[in-house]
Amino acid sequence: VTQTVKEKFLDLLKEQSSYEEAIGLMAWDMRTKAPKKGMDNRSEVLGVLSEKVHEIQTSDKMKSYIDELKGQDEDPVLVKSLEEAEETYNKTAKIPGKEYREYVTLQSKAESMWTEAKDKNDFESFRPYLEELVEFNKRFADYWGYKEHRYDALLHNYEPGITVSKLEEVFPRVRKALTELLDQIKKAPKQPDPSVLEGHFPKAQQEKFSEEILKRMGYDFEAGRLDETVHPFAIGLNSNDVRVTTKYDEKDFRTAVFGTIHEGGHALYEQNIDPKLTFTPLATGTSMGIHESQSLFWENFISRREAFWQNHYELFKRHAPEKFESLPLDQFYRAINEVKPSLIRIEADELTYCLHIMVRYELEKALIGEEIEVKDLPELWNKKMEEYLGVKPEMDSEGVLQDIHWAGGDFGYFPSYALGYMYAAQIEKTMSKEIDINRVIEQGDFKQIQEWLTSRIHQYGKMKKPLELLEEVTGEGLNPDYLVDYLTHKYKHIYQF
């Protein structure tokens, strides 16, 4: 049977996404269950498969199908798949193959050097690798091209449509509001007591509670599973296989509970993408920021709100150690929402989190724009942490070396976290006009919330660009005031000032 060009193109996309699914499954395995001695072999296999994907994306076949089909068909899934494939082709084709291979090798070396450097608190041993990564990223940005700022070309990889000038409109406003709020909180007479949460909380019990909450959120365990790992993540292999991982700390249940809900938010997005997008490059979240908005929506806007615990505190106490039996809900709620500037981003509370991101954004942007050099990073990092958060790292492993992102060459990624938070606040505000969120949560029924998110966001996968989606859902462009209002209102109530 002679295939049409459209069929051949869709077959090629299917081949590509099949390799990607295999890569995803291996990556999940490496980070959860794989034996230590098998790691080197596994890395080799991943390298071979990644090269296959790269070959397909940049093949003459791909190019000729794109050229032949462009403008020929009205089918929206095909049109968007072509756009996506063409953008990937152009982006990848602009980088010489030899350079790309060198870069991939450097990434894996840099990641293992970073792990060592972090353990030994030795920035100098990692510095040459980071310098090379920065040079590669500057070159790549030049290959790809940009209008105003070289950093824009890197932002585009994670958040299409976002530029330095857009960030400069919102970040300084948010920073000013948050630092002022932080000052008021530090001076507030009524401080929560986090010690009420301390004590041994067996892993098995945390796991049961976490599973129960995931089920209530609408996570489908027949299309997923919950496992343990060191750095929690969610991974969507396809919409019927979306896995969640978490980390248990028997001395602090918050790590697993809020971590699982966060990853569960990512997973719900992937589980609810329209099946007709399967085997296309559209069967995933539209951007890092929109993905993060979904995890932060569930973690902060749902599971850290009072109504959530009014409904779930009894369930929690059934699984929790005995000491919680006598702990009043009010004290519990205030303790889980304590604001305390920390050195470590992933331990940050919801108010200071954006400030951590802004430190990284300022430094990244300056590195790519050649305003600063890699050797200046530790000192500048510490200075900015003191200026924004009022805390100063004593050593680089709790400062500039804490995150893996730069070691993996992920420049331009960090702003997505803060954008996701702003998107989430804006989405929540819109939802609250249509749904009485507190009442729905108090009744313990998240179905309405999940259906709202699926119909407006999840089902579209990558069919819509992030800012287009935001505007369609909320009726306006990015507006950081919703996040500032949410945090101000919430913490005035908790800290009573």
Predicted regions: what they are:
Residues 5, 37, 41, 58, ...:
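C-terminal, non-catalytic "cap/extension" segments appended to globular domains
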Residues 9, 145, 262, 295, ...:
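Divalent metal-coordination and catalytic microenvironments
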Residues 1-160, 463, 488-495:
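A well-structured
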Residues 255-274, 292-296:
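Active-site recognition of the HExxH zinc-binding catalytic motif
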Residues 222-223, 276-280, 304-314, 374-375:
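Acidic/polar loop patches that form or flank catalytic/metal-binding clefts of enzymes
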Residues 284-325:
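Post-HExxH zinc-binding segment in Zn-dependent metallohydrolases
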Residues 171, 175, 203-207, 213, ...:
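All-alpha helical catalytic cores of prenyl diphosphate-utilizing isoprenoid enzymes
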Residues 105-253:
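Contiguous, non-catalytic segments that form substrate-binding/exosite surfaces or channel walls
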